């Protein structure tokens, strides 16, 4: 099971890395690409999401799972922090606390994954992506074009 969790983590990290690498050297575009990659059909597949949530549910009682899951969050957080820092500098945004913003984005991303997984109302990957992009439009209003 550890191998499965590691594989899923590497798979997600590869999608994220490719999303950033295949985007222009523009922090708003990179942020949009990074977060959109979370809702790619290869990542936000119902079966794969179910696996993630099963492992997360066991993480507290299984130190190996917790370590692997925490590594995923740390890598994601570092990528977000780097890009958001560049975006804040470029856009001269004030009063944005990067650690809190990153934690909020990660929590939202995980919550949107959960909505995809359990919704009986047809909440889909595209809905999740639209919610995230709408949020980013409000946080970074001078860069809305990247999130449309």
Kindly give the residue locations of the regions a language model identified:
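All-alpha amphipathic helical-bundle segments outside canonical DNA-binding/catalytic cores
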Residues: 67-72, 89-107
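Amphipathic alpha-helical packing segments from all-alpha helical-bundle domains
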Residues: 44-50, 63-89, 130
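Hydrophobic alpha-helical connector segments
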Residues: 17-48, 101-105, 147
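An amphipathic alpha-helix adjacent to DNA-recognition modules
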Residues: 1-17, 32, 77
């Amino acid at each position: 099971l550890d191998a499965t969790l590691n594989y899923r983590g590497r798979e997600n990290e590869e999608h994220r890395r490719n999303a950033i690498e295949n985007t222009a050297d523009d922090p708003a575009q990179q942020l949009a690409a990074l977060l959109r990659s979370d809702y790619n059909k290869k990542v936000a597949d119902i079966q794969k999401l179910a696996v993630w949530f099963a492992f997360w549910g066991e993480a507290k009682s299984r130190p190996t799972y917790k370590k692997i899951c925490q590594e995923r969050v740390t890598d994601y957080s570092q990528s977000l922090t780097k890009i958001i820092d560049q975006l804040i500098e470029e856009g001269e945004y004030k009063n944005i606390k990067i650690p809190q913003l990153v934690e909020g984005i990660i929590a939202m991303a995980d919550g949107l994954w959960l909505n995809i997984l359990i919704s009986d109302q047809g909440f889909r990957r595209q809905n999740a992506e639209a919610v995230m992009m709408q949020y980013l439009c409000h946080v970074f209003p001078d860069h809305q074009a990247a999130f449309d």
